[in-house]
């Protein structure tokens, strides 16, 4: 599932084609997604001006002038495709079948923006003006925002008897983090993913906040990580997977200079965790 860097990369790719533009035409081609499309989706979107395109956690929100917002989640395999004269020659990935094009928009410049989702776990929904979608109501601070501080994270960890990795994946504590980037940040911070969150010291929390930010910023700069389905809105792959230090590297030597450890994989709450048992305490 796309994590924060992948979603932010897609948002940035969509921004020139949606923000400030009018949706001249909209089609809902398959309403029976696992999260059904709103019956008035086409009516609300047609003629709407997108005044801002932002991200909250792993969601993309297109704020519409006087019409609320369009909320998008990519699910497991969702992709946003951009096609049109302004993009030059566009070659559709043969693995992306047109029958999985569920929502198609055309902006006032003729550019086509398509939500394609083979596994149909994605979501397209409408948020009424002045309302907040229930899925966004209880999210924690954005990890790249000023609200994500060592003090705030230490307060959230205080007294928690859950593994620190599980705490970081709790969207109520910090929004948008996922398995890949939590594993990478914990490695850089030298914290064992099995440590109880409440036992992480204040200096360790401060270091962890810095490493979370750094990993996310580096991943966004690389276009995210393309392990399976992720593509940027232009169709390009992300490249941060080539910079993984521990994620997916079970059995490889620890990359820390001078360390003789080997990257190990364990399962926590049904998810793989990768770490060096010598470097991470």
From Swiss-Prot:
EC number assigned by the record: 3.2.2.23, 4.2.99.18
Cofactor: Zn(2+)
CDD domains: EcFpg-like_N
Pfam families: Fapy_DNA_glyco (PF01149), H2TH (PF06831), zf-FPG_IleRS (PF06827)
GO molecular function: 8-oxo-7,8-dihydroguanine DNA N-glycosylase activity; class I DNA-(apurinic or apyrimidinic site) endonuclease activity; damaged DNA binding; zinc ion binding
Database matches in SMART domains: Fapy_DNA_glyco, H2TH
Gene3D superfamilies: 1.10.8.50, MutM-like, N-terminal (3.20.190.10)
Co-factor binding details: Binds 1 zinc ion per subunit.
Organism: Paracoccus denitrificans (strain Pd 1222)
Catalysed reactions, semicolon-separated: Hydrolysis of DNA containing ring-opened 7-methylguanine residues, releasing 2,6-diamino-4-hydroxy-5-(N-methyl)formamidopyrimidine; 2'-deoxyribonucleotide-(2'-deoxyribose 5'-phosphate)-2'-deoxyribonucleotide-DNA = a 3'-end 2'-deoxyribonucleotide-(2,3-dehydro-2,3-deoxyribose 5'-phosphate)-DNA + a 5'-end 5'-phospho-2'-deoxyribonucleoside-DNA + H(+)
Binding site for DNA: 100, 119, 160
Catalytic residues of the enzyme: 2 (schiff-base intermediate with dna), 3 (proton donor), 58 (proton donor), 271 (proton donor)
Similarity remark: Belongs to the FPG family.
Matches recorded under InterPro entries: DNA_glyclase/AP_lyase_DNA-bd, Formamido-pyr_DNA_Glyclase, FPG_cat, MutM-like_N-ter, Ribosomal_uS13-like_H2TH, Znf_DNA_glyclase/AP_lyase, Znf_FPG/IleRS
Name assigned to this protein: Formamidopyrimidine-DNA glycosylase
Keyword tags: DNA damage, DNA repair, DNA-binding, Glycosidase, Hydrolase, Lyase, Metal-binding, Multifunctional enzyme, Zinc, Zinc-finger
């Amino acid at each position: 599932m796309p994590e924060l860097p992948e979603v932010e990369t897609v948002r940035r790719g969509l921004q020139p084609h949606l923000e400030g533009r009018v949706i001249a035409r909209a089609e809902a081609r398959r309403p029976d997604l696992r999260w059904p499309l709103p019956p008035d989706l086409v009516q609300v979107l047609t003629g709407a001006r997108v005044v801002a395109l932002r991200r909250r956690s792993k969601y993309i929100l297109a704020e519409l002038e006087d019409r609320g917002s369009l909320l998008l989640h990519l699910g497991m395999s969702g992709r946003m495709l951009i096609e049109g004269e302004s993009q030059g020659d566009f070659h559709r990935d043969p693995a992306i079948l047109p029958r999985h094009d569920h929502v198609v928009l055309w902006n006032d410049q003729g550019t086509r923006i398509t939500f394609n989702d083979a596994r149909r776990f994605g979501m397209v929904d409408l948020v009424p003006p002045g309302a907040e979608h229930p899925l966004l109501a209880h999210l924690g601070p954005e990890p790249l925002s000023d609200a994500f501080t060592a003090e705030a994270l230490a307060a959230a960890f205080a007294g928690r008897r859950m593994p620190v990795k599980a705490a970081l994946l709790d969207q109520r504590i910090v929004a948008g983090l996922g398995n890949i980037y939590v594993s990478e940040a914990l490695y850089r911070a030298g914290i064992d993913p099995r440590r109880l969150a409440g036992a992480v010291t204040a200096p360790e929390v401060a270091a962890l906040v810095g490493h979370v930010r750094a990993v996310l910023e580096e991943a966004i700069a690389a276009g995210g990580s393309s392990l399976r389905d992720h593509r940027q809105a232009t169709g390009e792959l992300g490249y941060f997977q080539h910079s993984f230090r521990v994620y997916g590297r079970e059995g490889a030597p620890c990359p820390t200079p001078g360390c003789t450890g080997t990257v190990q994989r364990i399962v926590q709450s049904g998810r793989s965790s990768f770490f060096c048992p010598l470097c991470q305490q």
